[in-house]
């Protein structure tokens, strides 16, 4: 199996990102909506990026992506991260790579001061989120407390090890150390 790497996306990845967006949007009402390469580049690689975009690579192929941005929760009085646009090419799904992307996302967000992760999604990522995070009926899930802290430490481990070490959902109710 080719080594997995996760890194920050850069402007040279634009074409691959657009290909993944085209796969991601299939079946959505926006499927036929035109999307501008310039707008994508400005959104993630311009003067004021809207979020941090990560890509997963195996060999020289970009196979997945996820974005995160720093948020502030006024109820809890702390910074967190909001995850979005988590996508993995279909032939790589079920391999634990999504967990590796989320681990890197938690690691980067933690370094930026985040103490929790919130996000949601379709059936695929929601299975992971519902396994490790505390969710509401609106399918927005929060990975927080000790669970968030533990997930951040999984960054860089082999995919199978990340999946084996996934924190218990209940750890999201415990304060981080």
Ranges and model annotations:
Residues 44-55, 82:
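A short helix-loop-beta-strand connector motif used in the catalytic cores of GNAT acetyltransferases and
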Residues 88, 94-107:
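Conserved acetyl-CoA-binding loop-helix of GNAT-fold acetyltransferases
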Residues 115, 122-146, 150:
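Conserved active-site alpha-helix within GNAT-family acetyltransferase domains
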